[in-house]
Regions:
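Bacterial N-terminal signal peptides that target proteins for export
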Residues: 1-10
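Short, conserved catalytic or interaction motifs in soluble domains
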Residues: 23
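N-terminal export/targeting leaders of redox proteins
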Residues: 26-30
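Acidic/His-rich structured neighborhood in mature extracellular/periplasmic domains
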Residues: 38-43, 49-59, 64-67, 72, ...
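C-terminal motif of bacterial Sec signal peptides marking the signal peptidase cleavage site
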Residues: 19-20
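Acidic/polar, low-complexity intrinsically disordered N-terminal segments immediately downstream
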Residues: 31-37
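Metalloprotease/metallohydrolase-associated module, dominated by Zn2+-dependent proteases
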Residues: 51-56, 70, 129-162, 196-286
């Protein structure tokens, strides 16, 4: 889910892109799932540097290719390892100018602990005043935007706990896809949003989005497709208001070839297992 938030309170200097992203396995998306093939560096959790100027709520930190990944003390380090894997792989696949735009816009990611809510996240606290919706019940993740560049996700989804309300899909990939679109691509490729809109309107007119979450707007249309691309979306044999039969990259190619072609400009056709979630919708190890 993507919510346009009101303002950014985060001030930090732009960081440099980690050079490990330029390896062939990362840039070309060669098939494989091992850490060696992904070239993922060790995930070392530390305290956030003072230079980030973060709220005191955040006491854990990892740098992911120039993007801060943060949380309170309640989030286990294992969640950082899993989220770092996902985010490192995705950012290494991005065009350098897209990732650079995200870094300069101060994009960052926060992990909510299992027993924390959306409004516990400092940047999202103001949502407690929304009398139309209980955000702590509604959302276990929000996508970053230029106005509020923080993306949030939840421990139970990152680690694929059985109690996760979104157990059949990866919400971090969905929400970070919003940040890629609404921050990186909006800045680095000004025509991307219009091209995405054209794909969305065509798919909507064809009726293939009916009774699914994809039809909400072009932002959700994109984020759901990115989940498909990495084989981490939920699947239903018939549309149920949220999902349908399309939940993998292979199926997306048949379901919406125009959108597939657009995504192929930004993500490699990879079989990397970058999530605790698998396309069979079964919880599994890497």
């Amino acid at each position: 889910m993507m919510k346009t938030l009101l303002k950014s309170i985060f001030i930090v200097g732009a960081a440099s892109l980690i050079s490990a992203c330029s390896t062939p396995a990362n840039r070309e998306g060669e098939a494989g799932s091992s850490d060696e093939q992904l070239n993922i560096p060790e995930c070392v959790v530390t305290a956030p540097p003072d230079s980030l100027g973060l709220d005191s709520f955040y006491v854990k930190y990892v740098n992911v290719n120039g993007l801060p990944l943060v949380s309170s003390w309640r989030v286990p380090d294992s969640a950082f390892v899993a989220a770092h894997r996902t985010l490192y792989a995705m950012t290494c696949m991005l065009k350098p100018e897209v990732l650079d735009a995200m870094i300069k816009a101060h994009a960052r990611i926060a992990i909510m602990a299992r027993y924390e809510g959306t409004t516990d996240i400092p940047e999202h606290r103001y949502l407690v005043n929304d009398t139309s919706l209980n955000w702590d019940l509604r959302a276990r993740g929000l996508g970053g935007t230029i106005d509020e560049p923080l993306t949030s996700c939840a421990e139970e989804n990152v680690l694929a706990y059985q109690i996760d309300k979104y157990h059949a899909e990866d919400i971090l990939i969905h929400e970070f896809a919003h940040a890629i679109h609404c921050i990186g691509l909006m800045i680095a490729e000004p025509d991307f949003d219009q091209r995405l809109k054209q794909c969305y309107e065509k798919a909507k007119a064809a009726g293939i989005l009916d009774n699914t979450y994809r039809i909400t707007d072009k932002e959700e249309y994109f984020a759901e497709a990115v989940q498909d691309w990495f084989n981490v979306n939920a699947e239903m044999p018939h549309t149920d208001g949220k999902h349908n039969w399309c939940n993998t990259r292979e199926e997306l190619k048949d379901y919406d070839p125009d959108l597939y072609a657009l995504l192929a400009e930004h993500f490699p056709e990879t079989d990397m297992q970058i999530s605790k979630h698998k396309k069979t919708n079964e919880i599994g190890r890497y």
